[in-house]
């Protein structure tokens, strides 16, 4: 795929991914105001399995259609449920089966929104696509860089780190230069149906269901012991897949005899023994790591790592930038942090930045303890 040269908006056909939310609604409106030939596309990525419409797809489609009618553009629909199942959901299940905590939104962006949707839009004759993500792009000669969104509270570059520069070059991000209150104000000013709609949270295909109830439909639970760091068995877990590093709620071990009143946290998942290791206190030493190992690194554009490089990183969404040194290893990459990192979680993504430029990232394989463990 060759990167397009941005041309006269009046001669540029843009198809906007319309989610039924306020961000994509305002994105379409702004592009119209900038003079682009704009159309919308609503994509359905999950087939409801029991008629209860957990994903609210019907409501979202109605909202997207109402917005398109209001601003006077055509709305296409496309079903990418098969692609989502094959390229996102099956990987999601495999990761949980392996005892890790994946982030399906990152794969969804790479495989669905910036691949299946992009390819489909181009087949419809689009020159570019647009989304409501809070990120920006910068064209630098032959490359297109991915930049953080200007609103630090909404920046979504963490979720787009696995999208290639060529795909970014085919995409416009109209709200990336705005803050969320500005976006809602624009929507209200123009009477858009989504102006006051709540932002979607959580994973689409789970919706309002309890996560454990959803997961056990696909993966058999394997109960096991809950142990302290000293090896004392203090309870039972229903399955390691239901727990993540740093988790406090839902352990069912409060009020133990001779224990302090401090809350319990998940410190480690011993996959070999199917044991959940817990400890008390938000500052428990086992919660902190000095470094991590990462694999499946995906760079937005080529990155030279012939020698260790000083960068910043995020090990979770909305985390502040953390200074680190990134180096190649025989099996992947190692990031050593200047400060202790709390609850570094295998299966989640680490994303690297050089200033406001999102360079890319990868999957956390393991965390190195900040202090030695007995």
UniProtKB/Swiss-Prot annotation:
Matches recorded under Pfam families: tRNA_Me_trans, tRNA_Me_trans_C, tRNA_Me_trans_M
Residues the record marks as active site: 108, 204
InterPro entries in UniProt: MnmA-like (IPR004506), MnmA-like_C (IPR046885), MnmA-like_central (IPR046884), MnmA-like_central_sf (IPR023382), Rossmann-like_a/b/a_fold (IPR014729)
Keyword annotations from UniProtKB, A to Z: ATP-binding, Cytoplasm, Disulfide bond, Nucleotide-binding, RNA-binding, Transferase, tRNA processing, tRNA-binding
Enzyme class, spelled out: transferase
A cellular-component GO term for this protein: cytoplasm
Sites where the protein binds ATP: 17-24, 43, 132
Source organism, top-level taxon: Bacteria
UniProt region (Interaction with target base in tRNA), positions on chain: 103-105
Biological process annotations from GO: tRNA wobble position uridine thiolation
Disulfide linkage: 108-204
HAMAP family for the chain: tRNA_thiouridyl_MnmA (MF_00144)
Function in brief: Catalyzes the 2-thiolation of uridine at the wobble position (U34) of tRNA, leading to the formation of s(2)U34.
PANTHER family, per database record: MITOCHONDRIAL TRNA-SPECIFIC 2-THIOURIDYLASE 1 (PTHR11933:SF5), TRNA 5-METHYLAMINOMETHYL-2-THIOURIDYLATE -METHYLTRANSFERASE (PTHR11933)
Protein name: tRNA-specific 2-thiouridylase MnmA
Source organism per UniProt: Pseudomonas putida (strain ATCC 700007 / DSM 6899 / JCM 31910 / BCRC 17059 / LMG 24140 / F1)
Gene assigned in the entry: mnmA
């Amino acid at each position: 795929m060759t990167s397009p040269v941005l041309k006269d908006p009046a001669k540029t056909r843009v198809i906007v991914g319309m989610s039924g939310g306020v961000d994509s609604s305002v994105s379409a409106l702004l592009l119209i105001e900038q003079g682009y030939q704009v159309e919308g596309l609503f994509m359905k990525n999950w087939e409801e399995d029991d008629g209860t419409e957990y994903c609210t797809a019907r409501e979202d489609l109605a909202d997207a259609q109402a917005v398109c009618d209001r601003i006077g553009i055509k709305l296409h629909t496309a079903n990418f449920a098969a692609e989502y199942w094959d390229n996102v959901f099956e990987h999601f299940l495999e990761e949980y089966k392996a005892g890790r905590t994946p982030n399906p939104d990152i794969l969804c962006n790479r495989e669905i929104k910036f691949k299946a949707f992009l390819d489909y839009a181009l087949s419809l004759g689009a020159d570019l696509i647009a989304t409501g993500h809070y990120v920006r792009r910068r064209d630098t000669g032959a490359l297109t860089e991915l930049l953080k969104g200007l609103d630090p509270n909404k920046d979504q570059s963490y979720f787009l780190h696995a999208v290639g520069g060529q795909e970014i070059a085919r995409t416009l991000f109209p709200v990336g230069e705005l803050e969320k209150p500005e976006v809602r104000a624009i929507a209200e000013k123009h009477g858009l149906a989504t102006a006051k709609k709540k932002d979607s949270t959580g994973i689409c295909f789970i919706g309002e269901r309890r996560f454990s109830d959803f997961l056990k439909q696909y993966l058999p639970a394997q109960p096991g012991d809950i142990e302290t760091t000293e090896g004392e068995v203090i309870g039972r877990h229903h399955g390691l897949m239901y727990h993540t590093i740093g988790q406090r709620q839902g352990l069912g071990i409060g009020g133990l005899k001779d224990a302090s009143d401090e809350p319990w946290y998940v410190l480690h998942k011993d996959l070999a023994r199917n044991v959940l290791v817990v400890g008390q206190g938000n500052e428990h030493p086992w919660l902190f790591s000095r470094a991590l190992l990462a694999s499946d690194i995906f760079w937005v554009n080529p990155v030279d790592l012939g020698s260790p490089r000083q960068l910043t990183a995020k090990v979770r969404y909305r985390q502040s930038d953390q200074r680190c040194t990134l180096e190649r290893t025989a099996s992947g990459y190692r990031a050593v942090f200047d400060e202790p990192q709390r609850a570094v979680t295998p299966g989640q993504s680490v994303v690297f930045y050089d200033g406001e430029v999102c360079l890319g990232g990868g999957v956390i394989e393991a965390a190195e303890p900040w202090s030695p463990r007995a």
